[in-house]
Amino acid sequence: MSNVKTAMDTSNEESQLSYNASTSSSCAAGKEHATTPPITPIGSPTALGMGAFAIAFTTLSMSLMEWRGAAITNAYIGNCFFTAGLGLVLVAQWELVRGNSYGHTVFGGFGLFNLAFGAINAPAFGVADAFKDDPAALSNALGYFLLVWGVFVLFFTIAAMPMNLVYTAMLGTSQITYTLLAASYFAMADEKATAGVGLKKAAGAFGFVSGLLAWYVVAHLMCQDALFFSFPLGDTSRLYARLRRNR
């Protein structure tokens, strides 16, 4: 029974949105100098964060693809402010308490994006009204906004590569979503409506894939905690550790 528990603990650590390799060596080096006091285990917020991300991304992506004619994204302002905005920011703080800087940065970054995107789309903030005489300027501004966030998510993707394939694919497809959506707004600003709609739908398709991958991670984490099995994530940590040693 103890062997099963050890295996489960190891698998659980590998599925978290964090790095463990960098801290293990420093802990080993300091073990002979000081004894670390026992730490009470803290629950992981990763499943909640992944669920919030999945809900926000899949619903928004369905609107971007205009499924059943749902092309107006303002319907998801609640998701932006609360589910994926406030929710992910709170998850990020819990990751910080657990000492997970990468998880804190990723969840916090997506949370801040959703809060900002919700404010842009909420009529109470008057963003659209400020550009009512120049809609092309609004489209250009939104294009720049999404393009810069796409750069941030690109860094998330690169940093996820030494973890596993699912996180890398999830973040990579979300980065493509930001880039294509930015291109869509730029096309709209240039009055290329057909190209703009096509790019928007393509962004929705990549966003939908990203959301499905997040749902996959949620299922993995839930089954890992509650049942006797989990889903493969395509661990890449051993490969990258071997590459580092061979440098």
From Swiss-Prot:
Keywords: Endoplasmic reticulum, Glycoprotein, Ion transport, Membrane, Transmembrane, Transmembrane helix, Transport
Glycosylated sites: N20
Protein's UniProt keywords contain Ion transport: yes
Domain of life of the organism encoding this protein: Eukaryota
Known uses: Patulin was originally used as an antibiotic and specifically trialed to be used against the common cold, but it is no longer used for that purpose since it has been shown to induce immunological, neurological and gastrointestinal effects. Genotoxic effects of patulin with dose-dependent increase in DNA strand breaks in brain, liver and kidneys have been detected in mice. However, more recently, it has been proposed that patulin might also have anti-tumor properties.
InterPro entries, per the entry: AceTr (IPR051633), Gpr1/Fun34/SatP-like (IPR000791)
Topology term for the membrane: Multi-pass membrane protein
Annotated compartments: Endoplasmic reticulum membrane
Keyword set includes Ribosomal protein: no
Cysteine-cysteine disulfides: none
GO molecular function: acetate transmembrane transporter activity
GO biological process, one term: patulin biosynthetic process
Stretches that traverse the bilayer: 37-57, 71-91, 106-126, 141-161, 169-189, 202-222
Major localization class: endoplasmic reticulum
Pfam family, one: Gpr1_Fun34_YaaH
Pathway(s) annotated for this protein in UniProt: Mycotoxin biosynthesis; patulin biosynthesis
GO CC field: endoplasmic reticulum membrane; plasma membrane
PANTHER family: ACCUMULATION OF DYADS PROTEIN 2-RELATED (PTHR31123), MARVEL DOMAIN-CONTAINING PROTEIN (PTHR31123:SF7)
Record's function text: Acetate transporter protein; part of the gene cluster that mediates the biosynthesis of patulin, an acetate-derived tetraketide mycotoxin produced by several fungal species that shows antimicrobial properties against several bacteria. May be involved in the uptake of acetate, a substrate for the synthesis of 6-methylsalicylic acid by the polyketide synthase patK.
Similarity annotation: Belongs to the acetate uptake transporter (AceTr) (TC 2.A.96) family.
Name of this chain's protein: Acetate transporter protein patA
Species of the source: Aspergillus clavatus (strain ATCC 1007 / CBS 513.65 / DSM 816 / NCTC 3887 / NRRL 1 / QM 1276 / 107)
The encoding gene: patA
